[in-house]
């Protein structure tokens, strides 16, 4: 669902943080889980469509901006990429890495290197053009200018063995014939899943919150909920998206989410800052790609489970979209596992933590809105949740400050000129553009007080205009996914699902306290 997501760096960091916390409290000692994971007048006019995003202007039009030689450097061969790799993973971290270079070059567009790189990943070219403001970042989604072939996590691509030897839809450019088949198939299964989506979500949320309540009653320090949340997400998505209910397989029901955790982690280790003791992390985790055989057994179990229990969806892929059985199952596993399960596993703890840790009165405002809209017998459904402006704004603001996809990539189809807010630069054919979303979404030219969490930022007419510049789904929030672009097929389902989770929370509870890893207390609705 979070198509083209590369949310995993935050996913692994979150798991590591939660695991440390749980170990220190002796809550889950036996869990050896590797993963943890302007005012209206001042705004530029919105982009007219998702395929012509570069026409948006937040400064003078390109013809009036100065042409500037692109700053930055790749450094000496081997030495430059290695130095940048150590800064990125060790000495600075991703935020400071990009921010310090932007300040040094006095530009939001510059050349640099990004991991993975030398010594044992010699086939990966670490050279990138960093784009760190909303205006230049939008070029990543202009499919006339850029190619999305095999750039999910930059120039590095995990072995195709992780996907049964198939280039699944996320690795295909829009010009490749199979992209239209895979994207259309994904959009159709999402459309069909809407019939059971709400029912399965609410059913699994009931189980999740009952587990949290039980754990809180047994532990004065609260309940670590990430594992329960992942189990909830896995069961919900498997049933809603593929029709394969994990309850038919005891092994999958108990361990399916763990299998996905390992499959996800092993693919992206070379690109991910985890935060363990250096230089051990650099030596053992960032120096080479890990082989598929480490998770081959688990992946085969997941493949067999989908193949045996998702018959209707598999027939749909074959009869209506011309996909082979293998292509259908591997694409389903990627959409469900990498995009949806992985994305929600990162985003939902951020959302729950933001609400549970708030002391500004936000919970009372959310509770009031939810109960007002759901009152008078209306209940909670897609229609009523769409009327909850504050709830939706909180979802959008969390996505802005904590995008589950930190990095977005695209390769220049030909030479072209790229505009930031204050200059124009020349990009050469074949160069890899890289946008670091946590900085892009803090663009002060677009967002007032960009570092602050403002729950009602996207409320009202002025707030709705800002949705043109909210990029988390491989395109703007106002964009429309289609076979001609790479925008997340489930862009709208993601945000409405998150809103449903908030609404369900405040129908169940008057108040909760906690953070992104644990719930301390819950006060049941009165």
Question: What positions do the PLM features span?
Answer:
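Cytochrome P450 heme-thiolate "Cys pocket" and heme-binding signature region
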Residues: 458-508
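Cytochrome P450
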Residues: 61-69, 74, 112-115, 148-205, ...
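Conserved cytochrome P450 K-helix E-x-x-R motif and the immediately C-terminal K′/meander segment
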Residues: 86-99, 103, 110, 371-425, ...
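N-terminal membrane-proximal hinge/A-helix region immediately C-terminal to the signal-anchor transmembrane segment
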Residues: 34-35, 39-163
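Conserved cytochrome P450 K-helix/beta-meander segment immediately N-terminal to the heme-binding cysteine loop
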Residues: 435-467, 472
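Cytochrome P450 catalytic-core helices
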Residues: 343-367, 492-507
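Cytochrome P450 heme-thiolate monooxygenase catalytic core
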Residues: 154-155, 194-348
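N-terminal chloroplast transit peptides
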Residues: 1-16, 39-48
